[in-house]
């Protein structure tokens, strides 16, 4: 427990799942293992948010940035690139680019061109995901510390938060620039948890992407998936703790302590 902080408990009842949410095998096993009988309890004292596709409707925007970024370098867009690159940053992202354009391509120049296109688009407020305001306000009222852990650059994270006046909710901002291994490696979530002063087993990670869920699960976090562009597949259902259709459902689940 931390002075000045609140804690909430998540429980799992295998006979009564939360409306609109579902449990993955890993989540159900973890919760049952910590509870009594058919119910398990998890003490959550910190929440870590992904940004693109979870807080803001920006994954669709990123998908449109690749074509002009590549065209500026005289290169064609190759099908599947944006999906493979989703949720990655740094050398991981450059390696994805090399997979599509060859090991000898100038991956750094391609990524720089991508960020140049994104910088222009992100000067104005980007669309928020439904339920974000309500979830942040409730967590703030409960004195639950929050972090953003995003593969995006720090200036992009700060700009998106500042454009909506919500940076004050977060005591920690973790950027892909601060880690050497991007998602699906859990390094960025571990960094955020360390700065929040919470352990992975007591930190809730909210993610929309496959790589993000992989990272949360690999790091031992309580990982809730809120799918954006891609629905949860069999792998995700094995990895995540639970799935919700929106941030409103995340909030409902926390209030009801159903998961």
What are the residue ranges of the model-derived segments?
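Aromatic (phenylalanine/tyrosine) cluster motif
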Residues: 2, 8-12, 23, 41
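Ala/Thr-enriched low-complexity intrinsically disordered regions
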Residues: 7, 18, 26-28
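Asp-based, Mg2+/Mn2+-dependent phosphohydrolase catalytic module
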Residues: 10, 41-45, 137-140, 154-259
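Glycine-biased, low-complexity coil/linker segments
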Residues: 24-25, 32
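Short, Lys/Arg-enriched N-terminal segments with co-localized hydrophobic residues
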Residues: 30-42
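N-terminal helical cap/lid subdomain that shapes the substrate entry/recognition surface
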Residues: 41-142
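Residue-level detector of anion-binding/catalytic polar loops
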Residues: 76, 145, 222
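Conserved phosphate-coupling serine/threonine residues in phosphotransfer and NTP-handling enzymes
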Residues: 150-152
């Amino acid at each position: 427990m931390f002075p000045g902080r609140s804690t909430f408990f998540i429980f799992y009842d295998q006979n009564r799942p939360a409306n609109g949410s579902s449990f993955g095998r890993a989540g159900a096993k973890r919760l049952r293992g910590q509870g009594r009988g058919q119910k398990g309890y998890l003490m959550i004292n910190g929440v870590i948010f992904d940004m693109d596709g979870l807080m803001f409707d920006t994954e669709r925007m990123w998908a449109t940035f690749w074509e002009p970024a590549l065209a500026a370098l005289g290169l064609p867009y190759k099908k599947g690139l944006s999906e493979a690159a989703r949720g990655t940053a740094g050398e991981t992202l450059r390696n994805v680019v090399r997979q599509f354009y060859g090991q000898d391509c100038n991956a750094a120049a391609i990524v720089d061109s991508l960020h140049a296109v994104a910088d222009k688009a992100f000067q104005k407020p980007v669309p928020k995901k439904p339920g974000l305001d309500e979830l942040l306000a409730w967590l703030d009222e409960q004195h639950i510390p929050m972090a953003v852990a995003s593969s995006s650059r720090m200036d992009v994270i700060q700009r998106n938060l500042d454009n909506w006046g919500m940076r004050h909710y977060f005591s920690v901002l973790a950027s892909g620039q601060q880690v050497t291994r991007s998602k699906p490696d859990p390094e960025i979530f571990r960094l955020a948890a360390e700065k929040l002063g919470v352990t992975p087993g007591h930190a809730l990670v909210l993610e929309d992407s496959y790589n993000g869920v992989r990272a949360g699960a690999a790091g031992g976090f309580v990982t809730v998936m809120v799918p954006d562009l891609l629905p949860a597949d069999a792998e995700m259902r094995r990895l995540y703790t639970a799935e919700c259709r929106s941030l409103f459902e995340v909030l409902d689940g926390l209030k009801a302590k159903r998961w």
